[in-house]
Amino acid sequence: MAFLTDRKRATGMGSAKSGTLHHWHMMVSSVGLLILTPLFIFTFGYALGMPYEDAVAFYSRPFPAIVGILTMLVGWFHFKGGVQTLIEDYVHGLARKALIIGTICLSYAAAAAGVFAIVRIAL
């Protein structure tokens, strides 16, 4: 029968390395989304039933365009961090690396497409 201390049981399991920084980024993006999501819902909801020309004119104003762009950027950044953590915890081997690269590419591409669409409408 072996008596192991908590430290001895944890030896060899790896370190958290950048876990604190990742947690901080997720907390900041969560607070950002907590503020931006209601703003986005109210600005998008206001323009939801408008005719096309009125909606384009509405999003040509700076406030709705900025709220939309910030929501896109912070939302996709938060998505990337959360899904990357999920993949790192539950997927192993080559699939892990491929899924992380795919997630990063998807999140940056979707954020860029969303920002491009809003900027194109705003200008």
Where are the regions a protein language model picked out?
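Membrane-embedded alpha-helical bundles that constitute the cytochrome b-like, heme-associated redox core
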Residues: 1-123
